[in-house]
Regions:
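Extended substrate/RNA-proximal surfaces in nucleic-acid metabolism proteins
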Residues: 57-163
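An N-terminally biased module of ancient metal coordination in phosphate/nucleic-acid-related enzymes
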Residues: 1-81
Length: 163
């Protein structure tokens, strides 16, 4: 039996990933992965699109089978430390996810407040950063620190996103 690989921690454009959920499924299948979990940050938004892509492509090919796992990466705090917890095999039915969706909405509201604070801090340091510009740069993705870094790079404030 050939050795097969799985990826249980991936992100799509529903949070801070580079590929749409459907493209991520296609890439995973083309790499021959046995299973893929979509675990976007604090959202379930990409799961249905990814599942549709799996259904369209099928779960079997002549060479291998493929399993899609519904997941989410949950942001949490433990004192001053931030923790990321993977939730896997998340249900499809509203009754299965209503409490989780409520909690995720709270987390997204906290993230929005953090983004407002980051934009204000950068303006206080003399950089003309508006949250609207960061959101436009994110192109519908969940706005996060990398988008602020990309805007600062575009403005010529830094030489790299890492900086």
């Amino acid at each position: 039996m050939a050795l097969r690989f799985i990826d249980l921690h991936t992100h799509s454009t529903a949070s801070d990933g580079s590929f749409s959920p459907s493209r991520l499924v296609g890439e995973a299948r083309s790499l021959g992965l046995a299973a893929l979990a979509l675990t976007d940050h604090d959202t379930l938004e990409g799961l249905d699109e990814a599942e549709r892509a799996v259904q369209e492509k099928g779960t079997r090919s002549p060479d291998f089978s493929f399993e899609f796992i519904r997941g989410c990466e949950l942001s949490s705090r433990c004192g001053p430390a931030e923790a990321h917890i993977l939730g896997l095999w998340i249900g499809r039915e509203e009754r299965d996810v209503s409490d989780l969706k409520e909690k995720l909405a709270e987390v997204r509201a906290q993230r929005f407040r953090r983004n407002v604070a980051m934009a204000e801090k950068l303006r206080g340091l003399g950089f003309a950063v508006r949250l609207e510009d960061v959101e436009a740069l994110a192109g519908g993705e969940v706005v996060a620190r990398p988008h602020f870094a990309a805007l600062l790079l575009r403005m010529g404030v830094v030489k790299s996103v890492r900086e």
